[in-house]
């Protein structure tokens, strides 16, 4: 069988707070490469979407291509990411690793289109603990990694309930898309063990 993996390398994934040992991008790259190792050992054909290693192949050479791509900084990246259109083989699976925090009108249609091809798949949402807990109070300046979005407030704590409600809404939307298509949604924080996330991801793929 074939497994296609999309690893979000947008600027929002570069975020890392003091509460986490690694950025979202670093964690996504680690999990992507570790998954590639498992797929290689299982003699699966695997491809890395939107890269020169997108064509599914087997073996160590493909794994080395992945390692080279994931260890290099992208030449350019948008503020937020969404999976590009992909043509999935009928006997195949897909994995998307991202924070899925981009604009709703961009992210959700892209996920729906990919999931609507009749194949199994997994969404792995990777967030920093700060993005889940919103531990801010008083005067705070918020700025996206790409510096395209800025907001300053004297009452950060007052934004917490609205932010958490929006986060819950986004996760509900992801869950609905996953349920309709038979995909699975896995949540992971960058202050948690990557090993646990990898095991859950591999199990969701049926142990490949």
Name every feature range the model reports, one short phrase each.
Residues 1-208:
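Exposed, interaction-prone extracellular/peripheral surfaces
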